[in-house]
């Protein structure tokens, strides 16, 4: 089992003829992802990297049976691409694009309410189910199949955590990058619920950062519902108030959203937190040993 995607997921790439999309399409195909279609308006009928290109998402879905799309479309047009995917009733749309205007995303979020399409992102690295399906921009080779779920607001910290786990012989089920923007689709609790219900996932790494209250809300949900150990890390511990740290959503405002507050809440809800990024792997091992599941997590031959 895994969450959201697996080896049978049929994927379309929106904006496939752009240079960034082409590069990552090849990487995803090399990983074994079933990319069955691309979409670029006005370029239907072309074939790139062996993938047929269509003018619309609807046409691509009807012709190929794709159920998930990944968006590599420039920021001014990305919101419309998400809406088009939702109108086609895709199961999930993963938006990699950064710098989408906040008001665009507010409209998108409102539009998606009550619809079946799940949005992951924007401004995220994507979703990967180890050794099965990679949708996004993450380095595939560091991910190995196992029993730890990863959910994160940060792309590069996800890679750091996954690499540490793999080096320790601990594989992963699925890693989900939910993105660093203030208005996004899938949140921590959505992914934690999925991991909690997934038989293969035995423990979870959750990586947050300053800004907003998503981590605090997730911590309360974990305390009330989670049946598996969760370890956390919060980025931005040295950030001064009012200074945006990389992501649009990573800003402390009105005294809220500090790393200190988030860490305190996580710890009070039973989530062990790593003090630095380099300790994420060892913190998970510590929690796994306490839960008596450490041996079960050792799935990677070192």
Curated annotation (Swiss-Prot):
List of catalytic residues: 247
The enzyme's E.C. designation: 6.2.1.5
InterPro entries: Cit_synth/succinyl-CoA_lig_AS, Citrt_syn/SCS-alpha_CS, CoA-bd, CoA_lig_alpha, NAD(P)-bd_dom_sf, SUCC_ACL_C, Succinyl-CoA_synth-like
Pathway(s): Carbohydrate metabolism; tricarboxylic acid cycle; succinate from succinyl-CoA (ligase route): step 1/1
Enzymatic class: ligase
Keywords for this protein: Ligase, Nucleotide-binding, Tricarboxylic acid cycle
PROSITE patterns: SUCCINYL_COA_LIG_1, SUCCINYL_COA_LIG_2
Reaction(s) catalysed (UniProt annotation): succinate + ATP + CoA = succinyl-CoA + ADP + phosphate; GTP + succinate + CoA = succinyl-CoA + GDP + phosphate
Annotated HAMAP family: Succ_CoA_alpha
Subunit note: Heterotetramer of two alpha and two beta subunits.
Name this protein carries in UniProt: Succinate--CoA ligase [ADP-forming] subunit alpha
Gene name linked to the record: sucD
